[in-house]
């Protein structure tokens, strides 16, 4: 199991775990990317527990944490086999599909924190800058 960890696991990662009795059956990680954007990684459910809603519970718990901490957006890089799962939770695909380790993958994003009057100007600038960067990336690569 130790080979599944990296430097981020010690400093910037928050975990969510769902248990069935004393056995962990689903898990996921939150990783802060910037002050306003975070990424979900390693969302996994044991095969015998797939279809029971545990992956959704993990994802929703991490979304709650994300919202509470003031992040604006969550992203996830998913294998195509899980794309519909995330779309059903409100994520939208963006960018091209790519081949990684023999599996086709898709990036998805979800707005977690809606704009409110009390958000500070620095956050507004960061959001606009991020959107401009996405626009420039998409126009350059399409």
Curated annotation (Swiss-Prot):
GO terms (molecular function) for this protein are:
acyltransferase activity, transferring groups other than amino-acyl groups
Which keywords does the record carry?
A: Acyltransferase, Transferase
Keyword Transferase among record annotations: yes
Where is the N-acetyltransferase domain positioned along the sequence? 1-120
EC numbers: 2.3.1.-
| UniProt enzyme class | transferase
A single Pfam family it belongs to is Acetyltransf_10
Q: Is Acyltransferase there in the keyword field?
A: yes
Q: Report the family membership.
A: Belongs to the acetyltransferase family.
What's this protein's name?
A: Uncharacterized acetyltransferase SPy_1546/M5005_Spy1274
**Organism phylogeny:** Bacteria, Bacillati, Bacillota, Bacilli, Lactobacillales
């Amino acid at each position: 199991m130790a080979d599944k960890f990296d430097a981020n696991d010690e400093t910037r990662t928050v975990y969510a775990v769902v248990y069935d009795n004393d056995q962990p059956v689903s898990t996921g990680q939150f990783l802060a990317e910037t002050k306003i954007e975070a990424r979900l990684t390693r969302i996994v459910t044991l095969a015998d527990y797939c279809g029971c809603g545990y992956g959704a519970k993990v994802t929703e718990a991490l979304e709650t944490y994300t919202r509470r901490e003031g992040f604006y957006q969550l992203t996830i890089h998913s294998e195509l086999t899980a794309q519909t799962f995330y779309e059903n939770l409100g994520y939208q695909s963006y960018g091209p599909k790519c081949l990684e380790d023999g599996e086709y993958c898709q990036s998805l994003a979800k707005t977690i924190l809606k704009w409110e009057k009390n958000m500070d100007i620095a956050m507004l600038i960061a959001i606009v800058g991020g959107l401009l960067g996405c626009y420039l990336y998409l126009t350059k690569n399409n």
